[in-house]
Amino acid sequence: MSFGYAAEKFASARSVLMLPHPQGEDQSIATAFSECRKGLERFDRTLFDDSSSIWIKQLDQLMKTEGIEDPDREGLFLIKARQLSIDDQLQFSTVVDELQCWFSRRKD
């Protein structure tokens, strides 16, 4: 997995978190979750330094969907997005921004 691809996915996540949210804030957050997951899948996590490792751990915690039920098949990320507090939303936005910058500085 390339740093460039991850930077692109995190840039997309950051973009959907910006106003306005035509499909609602929760849907924007769920879409950003999906973009972050795509940016990190198959990425060797041993490549992260101390700072980025902390952001990744924060991101993993914010995106954690274990124990969430989805009887109406809305999508686990959408349900998780609805559960985030304002502080969680702020932390998520900050982590996405930090990781996008980190990946961008290391592009192939």
Regions inferred by a protein language model and the residue ranges of each:
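Non-transmembrane, amphipathic alpha-helical segments
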Residues: 2, 17-21, 25, 44-51, ...
